[in-house]
Amino acid sequence: MAVQQNRKTRSKRGMRRSHDALSAPTLSQDKETGTTHRRHHVAPDGFYRGRKVVDV
């Protein structure tokens, strides 16, 4: 079983965890209907960039 050779410092632990933060999803509003959706994703009503792309 692997056991660490030396204890990691608080600084090294913090540097490792610096990339673990979660970010809120970026939201956009549809120009046609004004609904909010994630960027580069189809809106719940099937529109993307002002065009109907999915039949809902």
UniProtKB/Swiss-Prot annotation:
Family affiliation: Belongs to the bacterial ribosomal protein bL32 family.
Cellular component annotations (GO), alphabetically ordered: large ribosomal subunit
Basic residues: compositionally biased ranges: 7-16
GO molecular-function term, one example from the UniProt record: structural constituent of ribosome
Tagged with keyword Cell cycle: no
Domain of life: Bacteria
NCBIfam families, sorted: rpmF_bact
Keywords associated with the record: Ribonucleoprotein, Ribosomal protein
Name of the protein described by the UniProt record: Large ribosomal subunit protein bL32
Region (Disordered): 1-56
A biological process term (GO) from this entry: translation
